[in-house]
């Protein structure tokens, strides 16, 4: 597991402050978490291939390329620890679903994918603190 990394101010204010703690903004908060995760992924030098890719099976939050590896990324954002760490909500069933989704995406590709991996990124926002990112590579 990677140590949480602080994110740039451009995505942490004021939009983030406006979304914290407001139940009616859950979809917007999730999208904001995905924005932060995408910024983090790009800071690693990876290329975002797709965001919110959907098919009949479901949705993949982010698909990125890390050199010769295509990485399918599940993003979870939380505004506190009342329901646990963001990554704790990724169940075995969700991981199976991510594998199905990755296969569905790969079936339609013809650009010579060499390897694939499924990662998880948790975004935590605590009151009065900068958001942090936790990245787990190769979830199973």
From Swiss-Prot:
Gene3D superfamilies: 3.40.1350.10. GO terms for molecular function: nucleic acid binding. It holds the Pfam family UPF0102. Belongs to the UPF0102 family. This is UPF0102 protein PPA1431. It comes from Cutibacterium acnes (strain DSM 16379 / KPA171202) (Propionibacterium acnes).
């Amino acid at each position: 597991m990677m140590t949480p990394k602080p994110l740039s101010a451009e995505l942490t204010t004021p939009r983030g402050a406006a979304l914290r703690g407001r139940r009616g903004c859950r979809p917007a908060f999730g999208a904001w978490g995905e924005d932060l995760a995408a910024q983090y992924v790009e800071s690693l030098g990876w290329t975002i291939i797709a965001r919110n890719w959907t098919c009949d099976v479901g949705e993949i939050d982010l698909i990125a390329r890390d050199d010769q590896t295509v990485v399918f990324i599940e993003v979870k954002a939380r505004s506190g620890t009342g329901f646990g760490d963001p990554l704790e909500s990724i169940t075995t069933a969700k991981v199976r679903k991510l594998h199905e989704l990755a296969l569905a995406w790969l079936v339609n590709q013809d650009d010579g994918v060499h390897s694939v991996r499924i990662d998880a990124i948790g975004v935590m926002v605590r009151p009065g603190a900068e958001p942090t990112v936790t990245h787990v590579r190769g979830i199973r």
